[in-house]
């Protein structure tokens, strides 16, 4: 959404499959998305829910349909299976081949010879050695070769168009060789603006009547770069900004070191921070009481004019994570059910704080959390309002049934944004160019 929207392509992101009336309200939009929670769900959930979503997208009839995955490819056979999503999407969305483009140099995500790398702490790490992703609490990544990783989730031949082909003018021939070998899923390398644009050219020129692509927002970065080169889009314009606000509320279930650093910086910047005991979510009654307590604490600070952060953890080494895992293990419920309860509870908490304090801007931190929390807020659709950091724009809410008066929101993956990100949200400012070029993970 943000990549296309800020490039001049009117874009809307729905939180549920839109009907004809909803589409008509955004008739000016040239790009339409449907946000979901598949990344935190089982293959059985996908079987029950993704076909209807894919059928809706097929009826829209876009030349390229993109199944958006995390730029660090978070997935496993039992949860967030990208392979299962591909199996369900291909017969409905078609295409002679299916580009797999996860690299996004603007986010500090690079792919070389099929292996994904990501920035953390100012250095570039291979994915299986990444300080955050190798220790992800739900989908730890132990394989950097994306074709090898994906092969655990889907039995399908996979090809590669590598840097040598992309940089040497042989990308078309490399793609043809993959297709001749029966490799319909084709991974694309990219390390810089030139290779991401060449990947975009390959996708656009070989889209056929329609194309089902898989990848991060690198797919949109690639297409935008190519469209600018051929004159379909104007050159990059000065990014928009939003007016500052006096207070914001942040709810976070992220365990990422990046979010932990943001919480610590927010505290130094005068935000009041509160721990929320996620272990209580193993018992719905205890969780309701814990959310009530967090609401009282957060509301008191907001009424005193302070911004607040309510968080379930500060980094991957927070003892709260061990307590939460133990509570989940003892609960007798599927872990994904309790994780969904945590995300939905934090969403309701944000809505209640907004309703009682007059807040108009909020933040939800945590990739898995954001989907559940946004659904709990009853958000109908989002449009991009202002860039704050790559992958974490300020968005305008549309049709937010339970958002308590919130008009603007940021849905922030745990690894997105610089240390002062929450202060940036408060100001409504946008990231500096250097931040955009090397987004820390």
List the predicted regions and their residue ranges.
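C-terminal structural cap/anchor segments
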Residues: 298-365
């Amino acid at each position: 959404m943000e990549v296309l929207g800020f490039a001049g392509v009117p874009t809307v992101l729905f939180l549920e499959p839109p009907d004809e009336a909803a589409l008509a309200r955004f008739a000016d939009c040239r790009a339409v998305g449907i946000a979901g929670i598949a990344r935190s769900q089982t293959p059985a959930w996908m079987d029950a829910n993704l076909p209807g979503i894919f059928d809706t997208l097929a009826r829209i009839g876009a030349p390229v349909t993109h199944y958006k995955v995390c730029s660090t490819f978070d997935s496993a056979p039992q949860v967030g299976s990208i392979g299962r999503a591909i199996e369900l999407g291909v017969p409905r969305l078609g295409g002679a081949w299916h580009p797999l483009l996860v690299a996004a140099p603007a986010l500090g995500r690079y792919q070389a010879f099929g292996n994904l790398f990501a920035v953390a702490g100012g250095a570039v790490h291979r994915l299986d050695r990444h300080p955050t992703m190798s220790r992800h609490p739900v989908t730890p990544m132990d394989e950097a070769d994306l074709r090898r990783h994906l092969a655990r989730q889907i039995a399908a031949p996979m090809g590669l168009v590598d840097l040598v082909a992309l940089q040497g003018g042989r990308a078309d021939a490399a793609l043809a060789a993959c297709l001749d070998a029966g490799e319909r899923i084709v991974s694309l390398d990219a390390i810089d603006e030139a290779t991401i644009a060449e990947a975009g050219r390959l996708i656009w020129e070989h889209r056929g009547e329609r194309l089902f692509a898989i990848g991060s927002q690198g797919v949109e970065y690639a297409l935008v770069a190519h469209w600018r080169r051929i004159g379909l889009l104007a050159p990059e314009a000065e990014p928009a900004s939003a007016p500052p606000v006096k207070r914001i509320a942040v709810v976070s279930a992220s365990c990422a070191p990046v979010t932990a650093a943001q919480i610590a910086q927010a505290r130094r910047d005068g935000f009041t921070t509160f721990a929320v005991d996620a272990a209580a979510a193993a018992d719905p009654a205890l969780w309701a009481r814990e959310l009530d307590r967090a609401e009282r604490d957060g509301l008191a600070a907001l009424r005193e004019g302070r911004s607040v952060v309510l968080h379930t953890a500060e980094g991957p080494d927070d003892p709260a994570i061990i307590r939460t895992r133990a509570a989940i293990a003892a609960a007798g419920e599927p872990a994904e059910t309790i994780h969904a309860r945590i995300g939905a509870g934090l969403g309701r908490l944000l809505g209640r704080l907004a309703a009682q304090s007059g807040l108009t801007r909020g933040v939800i931190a945590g990739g898995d959390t954001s989907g559940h929390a946004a659904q709990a807020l009853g958000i109908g659709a989002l449009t991009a309002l202002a860039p704050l950091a790559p992958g974490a724009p300020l968005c305008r809410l549309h049709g937010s049934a339970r958002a308590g008066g919130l008009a603007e929101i940021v849905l922030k993956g745990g690894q997105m944004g610089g240390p002062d990100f929450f202060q940036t949200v408060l100001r409504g400012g946008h990231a500096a160019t250097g931040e955009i070029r090397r987004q820390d993970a």
